[in-house]
Amino acid sequence: MSLSKVSVENSLKPEKFVKISWVDKLLPNYFSILKYLSITDFSVVKAQSYESLVPVKLLRGVDLTKHLYVTLLGVVVSGVWNVPESCRGGATVALVDTRMHSVAEGTICKFSAPATVREFSVRFIPNYSVVAADALRDPWSLFVRLSNVGIKDGFHPLTLEVACLVATTNSIIKKGLRASVVESVVSSDQSIVLDSLSEKVEPFFDKVPISAAVMARDPSYRSRSQSVSGRGKRHSKPPNRRLDSASEESSSVSFDDGLQSDHT
């Protein structure tokens, strides 16, 4: 048994992190969009220097070949100090996404643990998704910084254990057409025939606002937007426009300069 297996199993219940509908509770797993996996395996790391960045396998035992995305719903970090009770100091512990250049930007969660607290367990809700191909490369690490712990070099003052709850899925876009159609039918991950769902498809297109950035670059969208904004009328599709080389070139320009990375 792991150091905190009992508490981890209780802390990683899916209902503690997401709202589970009655459909998800009743339907078999193969009808559910999200596949919840409570991971009871653990990764134990030992901090042995002033500052350590130790890789951890958060998705040990998870089959990532059947789905495109992995959502990190909950993380429980537990620890035990391997020093006498009279020991001073403590440690700063952080779970880091090492895909980012900067540790500060990649920090998912962070906490401090004084050495006077013999055992501890901390729960976090990251709630963000990564592509399964990235998850296969185990991009997560534990960053540990010891502070004023009077232990000699080469010894192990702190043992940490990490467990997590994840959801695997083939779609993470919650405001798209597919999500709207799926929600109106059943919570199914199967393919959907859109021809028989025109009453759901057409209102979706009518209510989606056109981005101001798009309208600024192509004023003709204004007239098209107004032509489909009327209610109670059935509108035909706007005619397809051939994009010339200039408009194709402008479409490749980023709409939000703030999304560009400062890293070189």
Curated annotation (Swiss-Prot):
Q: One biological-process term from Gene Ontology?
A: transport of virus in host, cell to cell
- Disulfide bond is among the record's keywords: no
User: What is the protein's given name?
Assistant: Movement protein
One GO MF annotation is: RNA binding
Q: Where is it predominantly found? A: host cell
The region called Disordered is annotated at: 221-264
| Coiled coil residues, start to end | none
Family of this protein = Belongs to the tobamovirus movement protein family.
Q: Where in the cell is it found?
A: Host cytoplasm, Host cytoskeleton; Host cell junction, Host plasmodesma
Q: Which InterPro entries match?
A: TMV_movement (IPR001022), Viral_movement (IPR028919)
Looking up Pfam families in the UniProt record yields:
MP
Task: Give the gene symbol.
Answer: MP
Basic residues bias (residue ranges): 231-240
| Record bears the keyword RNA-binding | yes
